[in-house]
Amino acid sequence: RQRQMCIRDRYLCDGHEVVMGTKISCAHPEGHGLLTVSQALEESCNDALMQMAATIGKDVFYDYVSRFNFGAKTGVDLPGEEYGLIIKKDLVTDIDLATNSFGQNLNVTMVQEVAAFSSLINGGSYYQPHLVKEIKSAGGETLLENESVLVRKTVSEETSQTLRGYLKNVVDYGT
C-alpha cells in the first residue's frame, strides 16, 4: 500500500483517523477539510500527517528516521550523549506509525532534532554537529578547529527547497 508522496497530494481531515479500531484525533475535532501538504504542516494537522505516514508506509518512514539519525548518537562534542528512544521498526504497529507521524513515541535529543532539521532545510546535508567551531588563545592562535563533516545526504536539494517554502508558510500562515 505504500507509495511516494507528491506535492499535488491532498488529504481530507475530518478530525480523526481510525487505526486498528482506535480513534486518533486531530486537535481540530471538526476537521480542517481538504489540505495540501503545505496546509497540513501550517495547521499541524495530525489527521493529514497520519495519512501521509500511511501513504509512504512503515519501511520508508523508518528509513527517514534512520537518515535523520534519530535513535543514534550524533557525535556532538559533549560527554554523555544519549541515543534517544525509538521503537524498533519490526515492533511498530499501524497505531505507532500513525502517532509517530506527528511526533509521539519518538524520543529524540535536542541535538538530534537540531541536526536533523538543519539537514532538512540546508539542501539535505547532514553534518556532524559541534557546539564550538574553534578555540583561540588570547594571542589569536587557533588551538582547536572543528571542521564540518558531512555524514550523509538526507533529502534532495529539490525536496529541501520545497520544505523550506512549506516551513515559511508555517511561520507566515500557520497555527
Where in the sequence are the language-model features?
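Beta-lactam-recognizing serine transpeptidase/beta-lactamase-like catalytic domain environment
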Residues: 4, 8-175
